[in-house]
From Swiss-Prot:
SUPFAM superfamilies documented for this protein: Sm-like ribonucleoproteins
SMART domains: Sm
Organism from which the protein derives: Schizosaccharomyces pombe (strain 972 / ATCC 24843)
Keywords: Cytoplasm, mRNA processing, mRNA splicing, Nucleus, Ribonucleoprotein, Spliceosome
A GO biological-process term: spliceosomal snRNP assembly
Protein name per Swiss-Prot or TrEMBL: Small nuclear ribonucleoprotein Sm D1
Residue span of region Disordered: 81-117
Subunit structure: Belongs to the 40S cdc5-associated complex (or cwf complex), a spliceosome sub-complex reminiscent of a late-stage spliceosome composed of the U2, U5 and U6 snRNAs and at least brr2, cdc5, cwf2/prp3, cwf3/syf1, cwf4/syf3, cwf5/ecm2, spp42/cwf6, cwf7/spf27, cwf8, cwf9, cwf10, cwf11, cwf12, prp45/cwf13, cwf14, cwf15, cwf16, cwf17, cwf18, cwf19, cwf20, cwf21, cwf22, cwf23, cwf24, cwf25, cwf26, cyp7/cwf27, cwf28, cwf29/ist3, lea1, msl1, prp5/cwf1, prp10, prp12/sap130, prp17, prp22, sap61, sap62, sap114, sap145, slu7, smb1, smd1, smd3, smf1, smg1 and syf2.
Lineage: Eukaryota, Fungi, Dikarya, Ascomycota, Taphrinomycotina
Length: 117
C-alpha cells in the first residue's frame, strides 16, 4: 500500500505533523490528497522557538511535511490492510508496421538515397 493511501484513511484522526522548517502542527485531519497535501481543523501551530498559535483550519502542502506523529491508540494493523481492488491488466495486442515513423518520403534513409526534392 502506498503511504498516501494510508494517510488518506486518517480522516478525523488527531495527529501532529512536523514540517521541514521545524514548525509543529497539531490538529485533526479533514482530508489528505494524492500529493500528500493535508487539510486540518482545530489546529495548534507551534513555529520553532515561538508560542503556539491556535488556528481554525490549515492546509499544508505535501512536500513541506517532514513526518507525521500518529497517536498510539491508532489501530495500524486494520488501517494497513489494502482494501482496494487492483484492475486486471489487458493484454497488449501486437501492432505491426508502425516502427519507422512518419517522415517525408525517403529523406534520412541512409547513404546513396535520393535527396527527395
Amino acid at each position: 500500500m502506498k503511504l498516501v493511501r494510508f494517510l488518506m484513511k486518517l480522516t478525523n484522526e488527531t495527529v501532529s505533523i512536523e514540517l521541514k522548517n521545524g514548525t509543529i502542527v497539531h490538529g485533526t485531519i479533514t482530508s489528505v490528497d494524492m500529493q500528500m497535501n493535508t487539510h486540518l481543523k482545530a489546529v495548534k501551530m507551534t513555529v520553532k522557538g515561538r508560542e503556539p498559535v491556535p488556528v481554525e483550519t490549515l492546509s499544508i502542502r505535501g512536500n513541506n511535511i517532514r513526518y507525521y506523529i500518529l497517536p498510539d491508540s491508532l489501530p495500524l494493523d486494520t488501517l494497513l490492510i489494502d482494501d482496494s481492488t487492483k484492475p486486471k491488466q489487458k493484454k497488449k495486442e501486437v501492432v505491426r508496421g508502425r516502427g519507422r515513423g512518419r517522415g517525408r518520403g525517403t529523406r534520412g534513409r541512409g547513404r546513396g538515397a535520393s535527396r527527395g526534392f
